[in-house]
């Protein structure tokens, strides 16, 4: 157990900085390439939010209801709503409290040391096709 912990924490600072950079890059890409994207809570504050997660929503469109399905078909791994409502067929009570009465599709992206800027470019390009 001690060896596993040692290995997990060996490069933690470098990996944290790398992942924060990816999240910042995705925020900048979304803001510059998708009109009217909205971010939930403080998730754009890299130092005051969970650095491995970005939650946002997009303008309503004819593809809104099928956004998650279409992203999956196009090879983008992401989740709908909040982690608190994962697996539920009902909307997220957490996100509803942040953005009440929103019909905008919400998406949650997660980042790890295994992601790249190319992954983000791919995801944003697919989003641009759908929103």
Describe every region a protein language model picked out.
Residues 2-131:
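Pyridoxal 5′-phosphate
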């Amino acid at each position: 157990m001690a060896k596993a912990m040692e290995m997990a924490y060996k490069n933690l600072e470098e990996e944290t900085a790398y992942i924060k950079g990816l999240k910042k890059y995705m925020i900048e890409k979304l803001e510059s390439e998708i009109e009217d994207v909205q971010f939930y809570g403080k998730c754009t504050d890299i130092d005051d939010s969970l650095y491995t997660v970005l939650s946002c929503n997009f303008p309503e469109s004819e593809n809104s209801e099928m956004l998650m399905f279409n992203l999956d078909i196009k090879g983008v791994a992401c989740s709908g709503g909040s982690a608190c409502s994962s697996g539920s067929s009902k909307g997220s009570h957490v996100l509803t409290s942040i953005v009440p009465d929103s019909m905008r599709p919400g998406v949650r992206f997660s980042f790890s040391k295994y992601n790249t800027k190319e992954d983000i470019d791919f995801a944003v390009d697919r989003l641009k096709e759908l929103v």
